[in-house]
């Protein structure tokens, strides 16, 4: 059995094109009218015969063109009527189906607060409203609305049996003297099939105090039986004041993969610490990256989020923010799957200079550990952040910051390659004592496969 799909809009467009063809035929008929009354060039028989030939040809052309024009008009009329008929039939068929669906959803909605079939409504931005849940049988969760200043983002709605979870809303920027608001969590995926929603990003910290840290990213939503976990939201940048920077927010953790099949979600990146432009105590620290979610039976582990960078100092003196820690990679599936890579540690901020004693450089953040695996390759450890330079000074320069430690590579239980260890961060030096390089991470072990390589130690300043 064969089927024909009809788009009423395309049929109407074709009818309009055919009407333009008819207009062109009428124009040709008008131009041919002049050739039906050709005068003889002279009084001889040859000229008279030639004039009669052209006149007869023009008359025959007009007769044929009249028939074509009549056919074309009937074709355009039929095509236009067909387009209208299809459009009416389509609207008529949609209305009963919608009425049937409404009749089914109405009692379920009134009893449970969510429909049987249908997507959840999105939360309104600027209100932090949560997204609506999807239908019990079929439907995606709605996205959470973003938060107003000082207000957390709304959580994403959950799916029912089949569907994807909604994304969490972004957190609002912090009010003066307050921290940034957290991002909303992603909604859960369908119990049978569907991915978890992504977490919302954290808001920027408010002004006026070094306690106004950036908002934390929302966690990614978990999958059900089959599906991928949602990605964690990014942490917000720290706020503060010109002489005291606030720390960045932490990245959200990734959602868990499906119990049967599905990758776990990546951890969210951390927010950076705020710098200072006037003399004060310190700039902000970088936030920590989010950890990847866990994996079920079959699937790859997610990657850990990167740590945030410490805030810079552009004033004469002030402490430098340390880099944040990278998130850990997720483990591979219990039966099969690769482990996720650890996130990189954040770099320390850059210091200013003073006329007497220089400030010390900040330490780099450590890299996250790679995920383990049973059958599959283990994840590599994350690289550490570099230590910050010590500040120059007229008398004694500041000490360089130490590099962070590289993350350890993941191990393999049965078959696969062990993960490589992350590289240690380099120490820094300006005029004071040098910073020490961070140690590299250990390589992961493997039962039936090559072990991972150890990470390189960071160079001393």
UniProtKB/Swiss-Prot annotation:
Q: What's its catalytic activity?
A: hexadecanal + NADP(+) + CoA = hexadecanoyl-CoA + NADPH + H(+)
The record, for Gene3D superfamilies, names: HP0062-like domain (1.10.287.850)
Q: Which family does it belong to?
A: Belongs to the mycobacterial PE family. PGRS subfamily.
Function noted in UniProt? May be an effector protein that contributes to pathogenesis by targeting host mitochondria, where it modulates host cellular processes. In THP1 macrophages, increases the ADP-to-ATP ratio and increases the cellular ROS levels. Also induces mitochondrial perturbations through membrane depolarization, release of mitochondrial superoxide, up-regulation of expression of host proapoptotic proteins (BAX and BIM) and release of cytochrome C into the cytosol. May bind calcium to increase intracellular calcium influx, which may further lead to mitochondrial perturbations.
The UniProt record's further free-text remark is: Was identified as a drug target. Docking and molecular dynamics (MD) simulation studies suggest that PE_PGRS45 could be targeted by drugs used in treatment of other diseases: Entacapone and Tolcapone, which are used in Parkinson's treatment, and Verapamil, used in treatment of hypertension.
What sort of enzyme, by top EC class, is this? oxidoreductase
Q: How is its activity regulated?
A: Oxidoreductase activity is inhibited by the first line anti-tubercular drug isoniazid (INH).
Q: What is this protein called?
A: PE-PGRS family protein PE_PGRS45
Give me the Gene Ontology terms describing cellular component. extracellular region; host cell mitochondrion; plasma membrane
Q: What is the lineage of its organism?
A: Bacteria, Bacillati, Actinomycetota, Actinomycetes, Mycobacteriales
Quaternary structure and partners: Interacts with human TIMM23, which is part of a complex that mediates the translocation of transit peptide-containing proteins across the mitochondrial inner membrane.
GO molecular function term, any single one: oxidoreductase activity
Q: Where is the composition biased (Gly residues)?
A: 434-446
The EC number on file is 1.2.1.n2
Spell out the residue ranges making up region: Disordered: 232-251, 426-461
Per UniProt, which keywords does this protein have? Cell membrane, Cell wall, Host mitochondrion, Membrane, Oxidoreductase, Secreted, Virulence
Superkingdom of the organism of origin: Bacteria
PE domain: residues covered: 4-92
Q: Does the keyword Repeat apply?
A: no
Compartments (UniProt record): Cell membrane; Secreted, Cell wall; Host mitochondrion
């Amino acid at each position: 059995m064969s089927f024909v799909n009809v788009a009423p809009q395309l049929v109407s467009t074709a009818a309009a094109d055919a009407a333009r063809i008819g207009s062109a035929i009428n124009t040709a008929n008008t131009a041919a009218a002049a050739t039906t009354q050709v005068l003889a060039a002279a009084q001889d028989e040859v000229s008279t015969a030639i004039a009669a030939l052209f006149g007869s040809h023009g008359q025959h052309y007009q007769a044929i063109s009249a028939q074509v024009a009549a056919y074309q008009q009937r074709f355009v009329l039929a095509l236009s009527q067909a387009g209208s008929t299809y459009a009416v039939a389509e609207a008529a068929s949609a209305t009963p189906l919608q009425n049937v669906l409404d009749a089914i959803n109405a009692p379920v909605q009134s009893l449970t607060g969510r429909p049987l079939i249908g997507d959840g409504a999105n939360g309104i931005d600027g209100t932090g409203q949560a997204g609506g849940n999807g239908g019990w049988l079929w439907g995606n969760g709605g996205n959470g609305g973003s938060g107003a200043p000082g207000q957390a983002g709304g959580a994403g709605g959950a799916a029912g049996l089949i569907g994807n979870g909604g994304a969490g809303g972004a957190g609002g920027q912090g009010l003066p003297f307050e921290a940034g608001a957290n991002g909303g969590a992603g909604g859960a995926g369908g119990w049978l099939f569907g991915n978890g929603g992504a977490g919302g990003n954290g808001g920027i910290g408010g002004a006026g105090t070094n306690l106004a840290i950036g908002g934390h990213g929302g966690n990614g939503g978990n999958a059900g039986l089959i599906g991928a976990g949602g990605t964690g939201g990014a942490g917000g940048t720290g706020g503060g004041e010109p002489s005291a920077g606030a720390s960045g927010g932490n990245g959200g953790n990734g959602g868990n993969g499906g119990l049967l099949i599905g990758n776990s979600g990546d951890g969210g990146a951390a927010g950076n610490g705020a710098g200072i432009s006037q003399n004060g105590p310190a700039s902000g620290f970088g936030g920590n990256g989010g950890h990847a979610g866990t994996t079920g039976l079959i699937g790859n582990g997610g990657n850990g989020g990167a740590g945030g960078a410490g805030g810079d100092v552009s004033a004469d003196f002030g402490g430098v923010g340390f880099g944040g820690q990278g998130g850990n990679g997720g483990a591979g599936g219990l039966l099969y799957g690769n482990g996720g890579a650890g996130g990189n540690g954040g770099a320390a901020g850059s210091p200013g200079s003073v006329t007497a004693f220089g400030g010390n450089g900040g330490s780099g953040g450590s890299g996250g550990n790679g995920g383990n695996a049973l059958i599959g390759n283990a994840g590599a450890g994350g690289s550490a952040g570099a230590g910050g330079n010590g500040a120059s000074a007229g008398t004694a320069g500041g000490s360089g910051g130490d590099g962070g430690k590289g993350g350890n590579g993941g191990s393999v239980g049965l078959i696969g390659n062990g993960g490589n260890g992350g590289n240690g961060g380099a120490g820094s030096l300006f005029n004071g004592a040098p910073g020490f390089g961070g140690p590299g991470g250990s390589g992961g072990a493997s039962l039936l496969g090559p072990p991972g390589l150890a990470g390189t130690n960071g160079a001393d300043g």
